[in-house]
């Protein structure tokens, strides 16, 4: 119950400070994109978007595997709102204004920039949590929270395995609960409504 109260506090929080608000919005976008990490969002290309979906490869963390995992997330109002709010300049290949238009994929400098962006987001999130009196979180927590919410709201273990991109379902079993089946896209859209994105 306390965790749910803390989540509501965080989702309803807004700040006049653009840097802090951006960090919180990117945390929400990470949740909405099935737990995409900051690196994924930095490198999201305009060519990854269709009218209805976001299609991209998610690079898993070094702790698990370096294999690329294909993601296919249905676009909804929450996702599109943040894509517009933080849109990269017209000439940029990127969706979001996180990287410079001239930053090249696959270079060490771009990799370092993404890590720096993630660090800054985490610092801002820590300050937000401190100001509203809840335990500290990081960008990574969006993925774990999305997974838990997905299972608690009727998503099956197999569906969660699919959207998380786990190679082995054993990795996903940490979220295992006996719940009825639902369509992934419908469930994800309902969960995203709770992000309070405005």
How does the language model describe each region?
Residues 1, 58-63, 102, 164-189:
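Catalytic-site neighborhood detector that most strongly recognizes the C-terminal catalytic loop/helix
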Residues 47-55, 135-136, 155-174, 198:
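Short, polar N-cap/turn motifs at the start of nucleic acid-interacting alpha helices
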Residues 4-8, 75-134:
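Active-site/catalytic core of tyrosine-dependent DNA strand-transfer enzymes
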Residues 12-18, 89, 122-162:
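Short, basic (Lys/Arg/His-rich) helix/loop patches that form interaction surfaces
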Residues 189-195:
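Short, basic, alpha-helical segments at the C-terminal edge of helix-turn-helix-like DNA-binding modules
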Residues 1-22:
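Long, amphipathic, Lys/Arg-enriched alpha-helical "connector/arm" segment
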Residues 24-39, 149:
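Short pre-functional
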Residues 43-85:
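Conserved tyrosine-mediated DNA breakage-rejoining catalytic core shared by Y-recombinases
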